[in-house]
């Protein structure tokens, strides 16, 4: 086994130059009585995920929920007010009726328990229609991101946050902050690392992309999103277990790291692809895979819109290299995984299963074909769906 030298490991600089850390240090003197009498705000699933991403530095250079100038700049220019690339406004919405209650230090709660604080510096009106048109490219409430946008409050609170403790959730063994992922990359001596994200169960086309890129870089960060997703998406626990069995049998362990990505899905397609790439830079990653319809839903985005949007920035601004792949699939005639660039055969030779088709087969108790996914992964999915009956 080749051992990489750690002598010259230089990880990518976090966006903005410094990895934000707004997590209260362990052992810090803290008197819960300090929170008594302060206004309390119960966080939604998405806002709680945003709090963690902000506080741990995954959303560096942001130190809290966006103020109005940054909010409008991100919507209209895909940049913060100072020009830093940023594609999706990270906001904390409340109802207009409640907004006046929140001033100064606000206690953020989850299930009634205090999990952090927000120092309110601004309250401003959300431009929901503008945000829907520019960020999601539609005002159609059948789009899950747009539906969530219109369902939330119409006033945004802004200011720096503090997180009391990193929530390790259901995957403590795989839950690492950006600084912790950076430490693993440094310890392993990876000069170049590629990150891959999906909210879907892993299949052979994903594996193909992973192994092609492992020919080019030192390490692979498998970074499945485990925050809030649509109700019909495969549950995070099932997806993580599928990754575990795949890594056990088919991946080089010394060159692969499985770590969960606790963000919530917004289904913003191209805009969300940028957010996913920039945040991976903060995790210390040098390359990020963007495939077909990354972070998309339905027919709202073109197949490769999420790849083309990166031309809005220079490579130096991005600070992470985007690896763009076409749709890959199994060709029965070629007898292997291919793409339109490498296969001369028509679609009748190809095995392509959509996410909807996969879910239909699983609900019907059918086993997924070996050409589509590894047998071990197929069994994990079959058991998970059988348990739902």
Swiss-Prot record:
UniProt GO MF annotations: ATP binding; sulfate adenylyltransferase (ATP) activity
Entry keywords, A to Z: ATP-binding, Nucleotide-binding, Nucleotidyltransferase, Transferase
Keyword Nucleotide-binding on entry: yes
Domain of life per record: Bacteria
Entry keyword annotation includes Nucleotidyltransferase: yes
CDD domains recorded: ATPS
Family to which the UniProt record says this protein belongs: Belongs to the sulfate adenylyltransferase family.
Name this polypeptide is given: Sulfate adenylyltransferase
Organism: Deinococcus geothermalis (strain DSM 11300 / CIP 105573 / AG-3a)
């Amino acid at each position: 086994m080749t051992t990489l030298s750690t002598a010259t490991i230089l990880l990518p600089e976090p966006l903005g130059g410094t990895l934000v850390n707004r997590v209260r240090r362990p052992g810090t003197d803290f008197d819960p009585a300090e929170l008594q009498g302060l206004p309390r705000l119960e966080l939604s699933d998405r806002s709680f995920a945003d709090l963690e991403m902000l506080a741990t530095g995954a959303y560096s250079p942001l130190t809290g929920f966006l103020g109005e100038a940054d909010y409008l700049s991100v919507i209209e220019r895909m940049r913060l007010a100072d020009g830093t690339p940023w594609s999706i406004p990270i906001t904390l919405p409340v109802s207009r009726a409640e907004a006046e209650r929140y001033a100064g230090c606000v206690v953020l709660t989850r299930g009634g328990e205090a999990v952090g604080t927000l120092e309110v510096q601004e309250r401003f009106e959300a431009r929901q229609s503008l945000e829907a048109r520019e960020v999601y490219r539609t005002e159609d409430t059948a789009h899950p991101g747009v539906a969530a946008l219109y369902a939330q409050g119409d006033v945004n609170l802004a200011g720096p946050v503090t997180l009391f403790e990193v929530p390790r959730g259901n995957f403590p063994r795989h839950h690492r902050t950006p600084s912790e992922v950076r430490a693993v990359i440094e310890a392993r001596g990876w000069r170049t690392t590629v990150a891959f994200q999906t909210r879907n169960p892993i299949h052979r086309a994903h594996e193909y992309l992973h192994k092609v890129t492992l020919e080019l870089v030192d390490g692979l960060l498998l970074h499945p999103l485990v925050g809030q997703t649509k109700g019909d998406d495969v549950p995070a626990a099932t997806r993580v277990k599928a990754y575990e069995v795949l890594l056990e049998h088919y991946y080089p362990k010394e060159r692969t790291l499985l770590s969960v990505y606790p963000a919530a899905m917004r289904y913003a397609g191209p805009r969300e692809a940028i957010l996913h790439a920039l945040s991976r830079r903060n995790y210390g990653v040098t390359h990020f895979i963007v495939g077909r319809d990354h972070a998309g839903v339905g027919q709202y985005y073109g197949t490769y819109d999420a790849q083309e949007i990166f031309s809005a920035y220079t490579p130096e601004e991005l600070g992470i290299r985007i690896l763009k792949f076409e749709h890959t699939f199994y060709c029965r005639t070629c007898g292997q995984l291919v793409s339109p660039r490498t296969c001369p055969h028509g679609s009748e030779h190809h095995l392509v299963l959509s996410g909807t088709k996969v879910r239909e087969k699983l609900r019907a108790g059918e086993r997924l074909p070996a050409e589509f996914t590894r047998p071990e992964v197929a069994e994990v999915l079959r058991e998970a769906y059988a348990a739902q009956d």
